[in-house]
Amino acid sequence: MILGFIGTGKIASSVITGICKSNLKYKKIIISPRNKQIAKSLKKKFKKIVIAKDNQQIVDESTWVFLSITPAVGEKIIKDLKFKSSQTIFSFISTITLSQLKKAIKVKAKIVRAIPLPPISLKKGPVPICPPNSKVKAFFNHLGTTVEIKNEKSSINFWSTSGMMAPFYEMQRVMSDWLVKKGVKRNNAQKYITSLFLALSEDAVIHSKENLRELVKESQTPKGLNEQGVNELSKSGFYKSLEKTLNSIYKRLDK
């Protein structure tokens, strides 16, 4: 199997890295020359990487084609590429729907929308896919945990929550910077905060079959620090603002 990636940004680079670190079997990975620095770096790291001369070469030579480009670039270039009906085409594009992709691609190829995030480079994290596909599910299970979504409308919910990645990191940055202002060395501050969030996230995953309200409750003691923290953030509208932002992202995606 030959894998082809159109786009070599952060997501594409992360998926490619995860694939190369996995035990997946493939002949080679053909990547876009667009971001020369990332393309050359990937080729230097992994021996099965080939840099294409253009996007059409990627389509011509690949069994599976991954579209990892911005919506604006996607709208501009996809319609001019000549795909084959025998191919499986993956779209990581947030705002282009399956029906729009089918219209632009023109041939009756298998098209799957997927939502990988940067931790896929570590073979960690969920990968929602729509529509369900057994081969695609098996593929992404080598790189994380595949979540199959039958309804594209429902997939918008997952796309919306993927917009919380930068806010998650921003919260850690704010807390790390606060420690630095208090005299803690940056390396120590960032190591502590990121390790804290990792441990809390792992604990949440272990208890993910329970209502997360229980974790919120169990992490507080009467008049304790965590009770103060959650109450003050609630009063400030922090959590309502979080939900409002999710709704705003959802509306943008729900065309």
Where in the sequence are the language-model features?
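A short acidic, helix-capping loop that chelates divalent metal ions and anchors anionic groups
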Residues: A39-K40, I120-K124, I156-F158, Q228
